[in-house]
Amino acid sequence: MGLSRRTFFLGTTAAVGAGAGFFGARLVEYLGAPPEAPCKTLAPEEVETLGALADELIPPDPPAAWNGGRGHPGAREANVVRFLDWHLAPGAALAGDRETYRVHLAKAKGRAAAEVEKDDPKFFDLLLRHVKMGYYGNPRYGGNAGYASYRMLGIAGPGCTGRDVPPGKKAG
């Protein structure tokens, strides 16, 4: 019996889909992160304040010999602000914290993270938790652009297992 049209169609559709997914991911890696879209939930002054605080919490590294002459990006460069903008939008995962951010970022404008921590520890804890989520999370959620934290930690990325630990490093 020969190959039916249905089997042929299903097989070629699956192959084309798998190839598009594989090569599309490689193209994104080659071209780099997409250009940063403007924030839609946060106001420009909130974006600036949040970016400054986030970069104090996870600052960029200066260029270093151990990283091929490059430092690791800080929170702002790793798209943590955009991550938070997306997740604070109405209906998104952190939408319930939107008003908290609006009020407390206005108070924090022009202030150092240490001052915010001292004067407003509850908001500071929330901010720190969310900045870490954006920096260390899976890039598919909008942060950790270019796998910044994964490269810094020397891990393969999402879905890595103990077998993916680089030589000379211990798992766990």
Report residues per predicted region:
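C-terminal segment of N-terminal export signals and the immediately downstream linker at the start
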Residues: 2-7, 19-56
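Short, charged, low-complexity loops and linkers
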Residues: 32-37, 58, 81-89
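Mature-region segments of soluble proteins
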Residues: 52, 64-172
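Glycine-rich, often acidic-flanked micro-motifs
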Residues: 61
